[in-house]
């Protein structure tokens, strides 16, 4: 897990509510972060005190990998969104698919909103329904070759799950409906593989599932 702190330095820490930033820090040469560091008070406290105490410093190689991931995120997201849109369009034209929930599809009620606030793409995680219900959904999952059957999302690999038979299998049909999940709902997280491989895998698994 990694994270980034962005501090504009404009918050008034000297308002009586943050003594740890105002009073001298005896563990760090008696420094007063607000008085001695000015706008860098908060970020200096994180770096000089909290990071030191909790030990959340990663190895040089892991730091390098984290930076590489962050610096190339925008490039990967372009491919994620490009592949996801093509998959959504492909599924929306398949006669064995009952619905596709993807905001960039023209018939989505969120289309105009998505294009206004997410002009570069609306992500790569979405759901669709496969005619044949729960049984077809399970069969579809079992016959995929490219997709990995796991519950997480956002990987560079394409991922899939059938909630009704896995993550939400403890719910009754009525409870599934209340949760906004149909028995034929399948969740996809589209990865960076070649789009032809992704579409081929979906088609062959759908064909088998609805036989």
Functional labels for PLM-detected ranges:
Residues 76, 133, 142, 158-211:
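PLP-dependent enzyme catalytic core of the Aspartate aminotransferase-like
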Residues 1-125, 129-157:
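Active-site C-terminal subdomain of aminotransferase-like
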């Amino acid at each position: 897990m990694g994270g980034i702190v962005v501090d504009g330095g404009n918050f008034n820490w000297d308002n009586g509510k943050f003594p740890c930033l105002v009073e001298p820090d005896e563990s760090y040469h008696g420094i007063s972060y607000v008085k001695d560091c000015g706008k860098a008070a908060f970020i200096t406290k994180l770096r000089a005190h909290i990071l030191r105490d909790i030990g959340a410093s990663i190895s040089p190689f892991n730091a390098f990998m984290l930076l590489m991931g962050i610096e190339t995120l925008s490039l990967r997201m372009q491919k994620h969104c490009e592949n996801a849109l093509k998959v959504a369009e492909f599924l929306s034209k398949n006669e064995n698919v009952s619905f596709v929930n993807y905001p960039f599809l023209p018939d989505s009620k969120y289309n105009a909103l998505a294009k206004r606030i997410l002009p570069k793409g609306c992500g790569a995680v979405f759901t669709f329904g496969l005619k044949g219900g729960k049984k077809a959904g399970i069969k579809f999952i079992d016959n995929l070759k490219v997709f990995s059957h796991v519950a997480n999302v956002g990987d560079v690999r394409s991922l899939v799950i059938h909630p009704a038979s896995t993550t939400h299998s403890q719910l009754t049909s009525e409870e599934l409906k209340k949760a906004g999940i149909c028995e034929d709902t399948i969740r996809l997280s589209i990865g960076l593989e070649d789009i032809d491989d992704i579409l081929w895998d979906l088609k062959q698994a759908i064909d088998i599932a609805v036989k």
